[in-house]
C-alpha cells in the first residue's frame, strides 16, 4: 500500500513567499517579518497590501491602496436588499456566503481572471467584506444598516457600522491588531480550498465562496465561539480547575487549545493575551480573562510536554466580546481578516497555475460483475 498523507499533513504542493510557520518553535512570519512586529508596528491595510503584492509597500502605494479601500466600502443597493430579506436566525456564515455570491452577480468584472482583474476584485472584496458582515448583523437584529465612513480606519469603520457608534482609538486599534493576527496563516483548509477552486481557472468570487464554505466548518472556524461557550459554562475562576481537570481526565477536547501546526505557543495567542488582559482590566470585564489565565496554567502544566498549548482562538473571543461583538459573528470576522490572505494566495498561485488533481488509494472490490437487481441478496 502507498503512503497516504491523511489530511495532506506535511504534503508540499506549491511554493509561497507570503507566510512561513515553524510550529515547533512557535514562529509565524509574513514576508519574513515576525507576526509580533506586524501587530505592533503595522495595520491591517498595510499587511493586506503587502500580501497582495508580496512586498512591503511604499508610503505612496499604501496611501493609494487605503484610498481605494475607502472608495469601495459601499455595497450595491441590490445586495443591501438581499441582506435585509434574508430569513431571521440564519447562520451568519450562510448569510456571508450568499451575499458574496450575489455580489459576484453584480460585478461586471467577475468573470475576468486576468492578473489585473483578480487584483482589482481583491481590493474591492477586502473593502466590502466588512460592510457586508456589519449589514448582516444589523439586518438580523432588525436595525437600520449603517453606511460606511471614509474618515475611519478599516477596523474602526467596521466597529462603527456594526454598533452605530464610533469606537475609541484604542478599540479601533485593538480590533486592527486582531485583524492583522488573522490575515493569513499558510495553507490552512480555507486557503487551500480557495486555491483549489482557482486552479480550475474559476473566478475570484467562486474562490472566496469556496473558502467561506470551508471556514464555516467547526474544525476550522468557530473555535473562539466555542471558547466563549466554555467560559460561560465555567462561570467563575474558582470553578475552572475542576472543569478543565474533569475534561482532561475524560479525554475531552478543550476548545482553543492545541493546533494542527503549532507544538508550542501559537505566537498570535501571546500577542492577544497581553491585549486581552489590558482591555479586560480597563473595561472591568476581567472575569473571562481570569478564567482563561487559570485554564492556560493547567493546560501548560499537564499538556505542554505533549506540545499542546493555547492557540489564537483561546483569547480572541474575549477580545471580540469586550468590543461588543456577539459570538455568532466571531467566524465571519475571521473571514473579514482572512479575505486578504485568501486573495493573496489565489493571486500568487495563479502566477504559475496548475490544476490540482490529487489521487486516492483504491480499497474497494475488484473483479466483480454486475448482478441483476432481482438476484441480489
UniProtKB/Swiss-Prot annotation:
The entry's keywords: Allosteric enzyme, Transferase, Tricarboxylic acid cycle
CDD domains attached to this UniProt entry: citrate_synt_like_1
Active site per the UniProt annotation: 220, 259, 313
GO terms, molecular function: citrate (Si)-synthase activity
Enzyme Commission designation: 2.3.3.16
Pfam families for the chain: Citrate_synt (PF00285)
Catalytic activity as recorded in UniProt: oxaloacetate + acetyl-CoA + H2O = citrate + CoA + H(+)
Pathway: Carbohydrate metabolism; tricarboxylic acid cycle; isocitrate from oxaloacetate: step 1/2
Cellular component, GO annotation: cytoplasm
Gene3D superfamilies hit by this protein: Citrate Synthase, domain 1 (1.10.580.10), Cytochrome P450-Terp, domain 2 (1.10.230.10)
One GO-annotated biological process of the protein: carbohydrate metabolic process
Superkingdom of the source species: Bacteria
Note: Citrate synthase is found in nearly all cells capable of oxidative metabolism.
Known function: Might regulate the synthesis and function of enzymes involved in later enzymatic steps of Krebs cycle. Loss in activity results in sporulation defect.
SUBUNIT field: Homodimer.
NCBIfam families in the cross-refs: cit_synth_II
PANTHER family: CITRATE SYNTHASE, CITRATE SYNTHASE, PEROXISOMAL
Similarity remark: Belongs to the citrate synthase family.
Name of the protein this chain belongs to: Citrate synthase
Gene: gltA
Amino acid at each position: 500500500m502507498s503512503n497516504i498523507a491523511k489530511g495532506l499533513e506535511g504534503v508540499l504542493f506549491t511554493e509561497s513567499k507570503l507566510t512561513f510557520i515553524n510550529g515547533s518553535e512557535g514562529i509565524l512570519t509574513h514576508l519574513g517579518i515576525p507576526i509580533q512586529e506586524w501587530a505592533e508596528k503595522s495595520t491591517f491595510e498595510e499587511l493586506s497590501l503587502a500580501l497582495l503584492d508580496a512586498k512591503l509597500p511604499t508610503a505612496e502605494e499604501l496611501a493609494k491602496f487605503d484610498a481605494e479601500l475607502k472608495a469601495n466600502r459601499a455595497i450595491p443597493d441590490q445586495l443591501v436588499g438581499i441582506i435585509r430579506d434574508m430569513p431571521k436566525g440564519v447562520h451568519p456564515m450562510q448569510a456571508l456566503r450568499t451575499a458574496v455570491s450575489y455580489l459576484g452577480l453584480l460585478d461586471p468584472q467577475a468573470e475576468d481572471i486576468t492578473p489585473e482583474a483578480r487584483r482589482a476584485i481583491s481590493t474591492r472584496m477586502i473593502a466590502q467584506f466588512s460592510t457586508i458582515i456589519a449589514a448582516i448583523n444589523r439586518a438580523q437584529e432588525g436595525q437600520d444598516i449603517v453606511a460606511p465612513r471614509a474618515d475611519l480606519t478599516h477596523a474602526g469603520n467596521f466597529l462603527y457600522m456594526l454598533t452605530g457608534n464610533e469606537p475609541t482609538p484604542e478599540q479601533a486599534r485593538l480590533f486592527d491588531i486582531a485583524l492583522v493576527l488573522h490575515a493569513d496563516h499558510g495553507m490552512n483548509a480555507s486557503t487551500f480550498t480557495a486555491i483549489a477552486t482557482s486552479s480550475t481557472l474559476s473566478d475570484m468570487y467562486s474562490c472566496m465562496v469556496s473558502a467561506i464554505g470551508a471556514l464555516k466548518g467547526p474544525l476550522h472556524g468557530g473555535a473562539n465561539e466555542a471558547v466563549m461557550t466554555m467560559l460561560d459554562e465555567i462561570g467563575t475562576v474558582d470553578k475552572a480547575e475542576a472543569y478543565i481537570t474533569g475534561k482532561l481526565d475524560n479525554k475531552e477536547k478543550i476548545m482553543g487549545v492545541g493546533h494542527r501546526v503549532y507544538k508550542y505557543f501559537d505566537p498570535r495567542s501571546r500577542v492577544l493575551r497581553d491585549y486581552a488582559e489590558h482591555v479586560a482590566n480597563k473595561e472591568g470585564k476581567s472575569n473571562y480573562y481570569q478564567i482563561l489565565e487559570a485554564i492556560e496554567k493547567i493546560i501548560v502544566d499537564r499538556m505542554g510536554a505533549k506540545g499542546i498549548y493555547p492557540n489564537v482562538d483561546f483569547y480572541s473571543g474575549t477580545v471580540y466580546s469586550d468590543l461588543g461583538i456577539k459570538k455568532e459573528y466571531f467566524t465571519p470576522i475571521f473571514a473579514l481578516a482572512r479575505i486578504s490572505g485568501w486573495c493573496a494566495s489565489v493571486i500568487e498561485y495563479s502566477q504559475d497555475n496548475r490544476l490540482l488533481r490529487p489521487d486516492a488509494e483504491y480499497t474497494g472490490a475488484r473483479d466483480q460483475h454486475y448482478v441483476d437487481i432481482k438476484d441480489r441478496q
